Regions:
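Polyanion-binding interface signature
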Residues: 68-207
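Short, flexible helical or helix-coil boundary motifs
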Residues: 13-17, 33, 50-68, 79, ...
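Low-complexity, intrinsically disordered/propeptide-like segments
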Residues: 16, 29, 41, 63, ...
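Interfaces that engage single-stranded nucleic acids at replication/repair/recombination sites
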Residues: 1-63, 210, 219, 223, ...
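C-terminal amphipathic "assembly/sorting" segment characterized by alternating charged
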Residues: 187-244
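Short amphipathic alpha-helical segments
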Residues: 42, 93, 97-101, 165, ...
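Intrinsic-disorder/low-complexity, polar/charged segments
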Residues: 18, 34-39, 68-77, 83-87, ...
Length: 244
């Protein structure tokens, strides 16, 4: 989208501050303001608009001496709104996953789990959702190569078991899993030596994770963590106790 078009949209938004600007911008772009109702095409429209705003803002700061102050204010205003929409998208995509993951695993392991998004997961870029034991810094589970778009529209995900910055420990755990393959769930592959990614579990869902209701999400994750990964994780957690 061209700079003047974005400035015009920004001026229109600022002209009516009584309504939630994020909703008004979404209505302007896709005809409604529900993140959960975005089609894939509408998601791309919002993403492209926000990327255009970021690029124009960046260029305006480079050319600040020659820019019109009112245009700078307009772009800065709509940039802030677009970043708020980004936060809304991230929460809609990952909020239930993070909450349910923490709730389920904390019931099993006495409230010691943390769940965090890493990277620019709100858009099309690849990030991670890290799932770790608070007292063990060296090992964790991660949803890898994940972003809001495949949370809303995909049905294939990868859950990795990783060891951070400790290749010897990684190899020890890898050797344990190769020696006792019963510890691994189905659809799980062990990665090569010298890598801190130990294993990748391929997760397939009947519908996109972010499209699930809270009840559906709870049921799916409960099965994923407690039935398919529970035995493997429990055995590994016992091993982790020597590596605080």
């Amino acid at each position: 989208m061209k700079k003047q078009e974005i400035v015009n949209i920004a001026n229109e938004l600022m002209g009516n501050p009584s309504k939630k600007q994020e909703y008004r911008l979404l209505n302007s772009l896709v005809g409604h303001h529900s993140i959960k109702r975005l089609t894939e095409e509408q998601f791309d429209t919002v993403y492209t608009f926000c990327e255009d705003v970021s690029k124009i803002r960046e260029q305006m700061f480079k050319d600040l001496v020659t820019e019109n102050d009112s245009e700078v204010d307009a772009i800065e205003s709509i940039y802030n709104v677009s970043q708020s929409i980004k936060d809304m998208i991230e929460e809609a995509a990952f909020g239930e996953l993070k909450k349910n993951t923490a709730d389920i695993l904390n019931r099993w392991w006495k409230k010691v789990w943390r769940v965090e998004c890493r990277g620019n997961v709100a858009w099309n870029n690849c990030g991670t959702v890290q799932i770790g034991l608070k007292e063990f810094a060296k090992a964790r589970l991660e949803f890898v190569g994940i972003n809001a778009k495949n949370m809303f529209f995909g049905n294939e995900y990868k859950l990795a078991f990783r060891v951070e910055r400790d290749t010897s420990f990684a190899n020890e755990i890898r050797d344990l899993l190769m020696k006792f393959p019963i510890l691994l769930p189905c659809n799980c592959e062990i990665r090569e030596k010298e890598s801190t990614t130990i294993a990748i579990y391929n997760v397939h869902t009947a519908k996109p994770l972010a499209a699930m209701t809270s009840k559906q999400m709870t049921k799916f994750l409960n099965e994923l963590y407690t039935k398919k990964l529970n035995y493997c994780c429990y055995q590994l957690v016992e091993r982790f106790k020597d590596y605080k």
